[in-house]
Amino acid sequence: MNSVKCEIKKLIIPTYPEPSAEELPMFAENRVHQRTSGRPYPNKVVLKVNREEKIDKEYTAVVLENEYLKIEILPEIGGRIYSALDKTTGYDFFYKQHVIKPALIGVLGSWISGGVEFNWPFHHRASGFMPCDFVTETLPDGTAVC
């Protein structure tokens, strides 16, 4: 395997479902998030966590793989790199969460630890727990890009 291959697959991950968001987000303007605050409107804010119910949830994963690495990306959770496996050693070189258990750390509430998230314009961005779009393409040389 000399090039990067791309596969879309389903992963079942035990998940604590996200509670309903605040219906009046303008009242969450004074919520302090890691020494930052702001106006979330028109976005809704999750102000609580669910610890009573855990379900097996199916996630779409974009898997990029070559002979050395296997990278799993979860577009449904902000496009976060869920796992990165060094195939030569069998070592996951980012922390891989085995349970999705949101905490109230994100700008709009829900955030999970593990993997790698895209952080812009600052840490734990507003869309870090929101679904994102993705496109995969195979280049003329057979290399996959996402």
Predicted regions and their residues:
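Active-site beta-strand termini and strand-to-loop segments that position acidic
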Residues: L64-E67, D86
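Intrinsically disordered, low-structural-confidence terminal and linker regions
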Residues: M1-S20
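Extended, loop-rich substrate-binding clefts of extracytoplasmic carbohydrate-active enzymes
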Residues: M26-E65, S113-C146
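Primarily extracytoplasmic ectodomains and periplasmic/lumenal surface modules that are beta-strand-rich
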Residues: L69-E72, G78-Y82, T89-D92
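Beta-hairpin (beta-strand-turn-beta-strand) motif
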Residues: E76-G78, K87, H98-I100, H123, ...
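A short, sequence-level motif marking secondary-structure junctions
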Residues: K10-T15, L74-I81, H98-P102
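N-terminal localization/anchoring segments of enzymes in phospholipid and broader phosphate metabolism
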Residues: V62, I81-A84
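Active-site-surrounding "flap" and adjacent substrate/cofactor-binding loops of secreted or lumenal enzymes
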Residues: T88-V107
